[in-house]
Amino acid sequence: MTIHAQEYWRQRFAADREQLEKRRQEGFAQGAKAAAAMRKRWSQIRAVHLFGSVLDDRFRSHSDLDLLVEGLPPAALLDAIALAEGAGPLPVDLKRQEDLSEDLVQRLLRKSQTL
């Protein structure tokens, strides 16, 4: 590979990493915005947690935003997903804490960030 090709690929990979980090940061902002909007709409929400690949090096361009919500009414699930997806560019995987086993909740909370 020529020196020009090496430099091209070095720059390309750096730009890709920069773009991915920008998208990850947008995910953080989306999570915070979604948490605030959900709390405003459903006052019974006790906690919103961000978990999954957005918090570590597994985040990729196709990654989604993983949210765990405690206290969201069951009938509000689809509205909450729509609200969270409207808060930013990432698709959202939203889980009601009450729908999960205690073991799974504890595993998710160990590697989560409260919003």
Locate predicted features:
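Catalytic core of pol beta-like nucleotidyltransferases
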Residues: 1-44, 55-61, 71-115
